[in-house]
From Swiss-Prot:
Biological process according to GO: DNA recombination; regulation of DNA recombination
Protein name: Recombination-associated protein RdgC
Species this protein is from: Aeromonas hydrophila subsp. hydrophila (strain ATCC 7966 / DSM 30187 / BCRC 13018 / CCUG 14551 / JCM 1027 / KCTC 2358 / NCIMB 9240 / NCTC 8049)
Keyword terms of this UniProt record: Cytoplasm, DNA recombination
Main location: cytoplasm
Keyword Cytoplasm on entry: yes
PANTHER family the record matches: RECOMBINATION-ASSOCIATED PROTEIN RDGC
Subcellular location: Cytoplasm, Nucleoid
Amino acid sequence: MWFKNLQIYRFTRPFELTVEQLETQLEACAFTPCGSQDISRFGWVKPLGKFGSTLTHSAAGHILICARKEEKMLPGTVVKEMLAEKVEAIEFEQGRALKKKEKEALKEEILHTLLPRAFSRTSQTFAWINPADNLMVVDAGSAKKADDLLALLRKSIGTLPVVPVALKNPPEITMTEWLNEGNLPASFTLEDEAELRSAMEHGGIIRCKQQDLMTDEIKNHLANDKLVTKLALNWGETLSFVLGDDLSIKRLKFSEELREQNDDVTSEDPAARLDADFALVTAELAQFIPALFAALGGEEQSI
């Protein structure tokens, strides 16, 4: 429930589905485990897990959904070795080289044999729909993983008018100005980590950790055409995170003081605690996200 990464999207049209309508449409793409011949499966699961009963969870107008992916683990080297052995044996027996289509058919046979015995790996991706602010946020460490969830949601509901948030100024320019001037917007403070990249196409990369970012050494790098492409920040003493030049937020952490606010919620009802945590997280992020956009110079356009 405590998001660790944020990939942020803006609705280009208002999200008007009710929770009940969304629930019905998600059911058509509910997750089912891999069958013996499936290499992967992707679908919706209950965001509250065993403590929930629906594919959606809502609190104060915010909606939480969760997608699960199961993938069969088939090491490419194993398949390649088995294929090479089969090809060699058949070519020796028949005295001719196999054609490309024949090799592909053999590979399919090998996969068909191995899949039922392959181990599975599962992962879950949460997403938060904020209709009031026309925002959708995916807890994913990469844009690709977020795109997978968005594609599944689009398939489930027919259309999903969202785009990555576009700012008036590139984030790397603004972050570079912050380090150059040593002056951050209100409520934001520097931490001790950054990534600097050369503005040149094949230039160098400098990664700083556990370092004072206001030193002359850092300023010299910036003076030599380096741009800040990742920057560790703190907001309001409640959130710490690493901001990327693609506007992604990673390694998001909530302060202990914030996390303890729901300690009075009974532990005898896990669903109630999860609901309270979701309400707390979304309330905080609903304030943080517009503050971040404003600090970075504002959005290019929004509905």
